[in-house]
From Swiss-Prot:
Catalyzes the hydrolysis of 1,4-dihydroxy-2-naphthoyl-CoA (DHNA-CoA) to 1,4-dihydroxy-2-naphthoate (DHNA), a reaction involved in phylloquinone (vitamin K1) biosynthesis. It holds the Pfam family 4HBT_2. It is an enzyme of class 3 (hydrolase). The active site is at D15. Belongs to the 4-hydroxybenzoyl-CoA thioesterase family. DHNA-CoA hydrolase subfamily. One of its GO terms (biological process) is phylloquinone biosynthetic process. It catalyses: 1,4-dihydroxy-2-naphthoyl-CoA + H2O = 1,4-dihydroxy-2-naphthoate + CoA + H(+). The keyword Hydrolase applies. This is 1,4-dihydroxy-2-naphthoyl-CoA hydrolase. InterPro entries: DHNA_CoA_hydrolase (IPR022829), HotDog_dom_sf (IPR029069). Keywords: Hydrolase.
Length: 138
């Protein structure tokens, strides 16, 4: 199962050449991640300010197939996958409305669950495990 997030490319997302700046693709993907959490009724304010659990990104990558310009309508497909008790990875595909099923960019982020003060790994919260389970297909 996937989560879909729609967004328009804003002028601030682009570089001097008028295309989406590469780092901003990751920011757009992170917006999709946040939207999926919110759609699952996870309180974002509590989630991102939690003093007992933090889920930083430990690896990210992005590949590009075609340019994206200001005003382009994007659909971001988000597909999380669990990697054990304390980490998960999210794969993203970014589609341009006018191109259809061909992706413009692909990205992934790997997240690990830690305690914010000790920085030691810990198990994912029940809330995040439920969110991850909602994407599994049996």
């Amino acid at each position: 199962m996937s989560f879909y997030y729609r967004r328009i490319v804003h002028f601030q997302d682009t570089d001097a050449a008028g295309v989406v700046y590469f780092v901003n693709v990751l920011a757009i993907c992170h917006e999709a991640y946040e939207a999926s959490l919110a759609a699952f009724d996870i309180n974002l304010k509590v989630f991102f300010s939690n003093q007992e659990i933090a889920i930083p990104i430990i690896h990210a990558n992005v590949d590009f197939r075609r340019p994206m310009f200001c005003g382009d309508e994007l659909t971001i497909e988000l597909m999380p996958k669990t990697w054990g008790d304390d980490e998960f990875e999210i794969s993203y595909q970014v589609f341009l409305k006018e191109v259809g099923k061909k992706w413009a960019a692909r990205a992934s982020t790997k997240h690990v669950c830690i305690h914010p003060q000790s920085k030691s790994r810990q198990k994912l919260s029940d809330e995040i495990r439920r969110w991850l389970l909602s994407f599994q297909t049996f």
